[in-house]
Amino acid sequence: MARAVAMAVRLGNSSIRQGIRRSIFRRLGLAILLGGTFMLPAGRPAAAVEVLPHKAIYILHSRQVPGAEETVTADGMLIFEWIDTCDGWSINQRAKLRLGGGDEDEEEAGFEWRQITWESKDGRRYRYQSEEFRNGERGDQRRGEASVESSGKGAVTTALPTRGRHELPAGVMLPTAHSLRLLQAAASGEGFLSANVFDGTVSDEPITITAALGPGTLHWHDQDKQFPALAKVQSRPVDLAFFLNPGPEGLPDFEQSLQVYDNGVIGKMVFSFAGIPMEGDLRQLDVSSKEKCKAP
């Protein structure tokens, strides 16, 4: 038991940090939605998607693996807030995780991650900043902004961890635009979607994300009884694969499964944190009031 925990803690600057970025936080952005209209492939009209600005709280906990001799546990909480700022969407995310074991003398490690982003409603402009903490000490910080032209090409200007500017390839999407595109694909009956997405909190380069979209269903695990905002709203399983540096084997760097409602709320998530099987359960859902926007 002690060896397993110690190994996981020593991986704090590699596997754990990458696990944080590639798992919980990046694809909670699936609920970060962009209003507007896109066209689906082959000229099919985009399905209407009505998103729900909200604040959601998730309880994170490790899952037991049958037959495992040693167990490293992780638990925590994630707070996700999506705000309509009239000209764009502001996203606030904060997560805390505690890694430890079942023995009283085991060392515990605490991790915290914060992110604030803003994206214009036309999917062309994007600002981001994130920071990580390990046992209360500040770690990685990232800050920058990106833009995408009507031609599909884009550019990134970074402030942290280093200052610089570089181009983005044609066809790249910003995260909120990609999130809405996923919901539109699901509502239109598509079963698969692949895109290059620039997020900034993971890498200065775009990430290839593939999504397998399942059929929709009502009353998933009776969550609509607990959360009135989910009543009469379909949800569906979405399996995501992330490719940071695609190799010849074609294997993803990370995978994650979500139960996603058609209004953008995530009901459940299943992922891996530093090799530990994890789940995230929706425990609180507050609907945000709409901003009073001035006419342009």
Residue map of PLM features:
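A short, structured loop/turn motif at beta-sheet edges
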Residues: 48-53, 81-90, 118-124, 229-232, ...
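Hydrophobic/aromatic-rich structural module bridging two neighboring secondary-structure elements via a short loop
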Residues: 93-150
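Bacterial N-terminal signal peptides
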Residues: 27-41
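Mature, soluble, non-transmembrane domains
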Residues: 131-296
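Short, surface-exposed coil-to-beta transition loops
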Residues: 73-78, 110-114, 139-143, 251-255
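N-terminal cleavable signal peptides for secretion/export
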Residues: 44-108
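N-terminal secretory signal peptides that target proteins for export/translocation
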Residues: 1-25
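Short beta-strand segments that buttress and anchor functional surface loops
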Residues: 57-63, 93-98, 128-133, 238-247
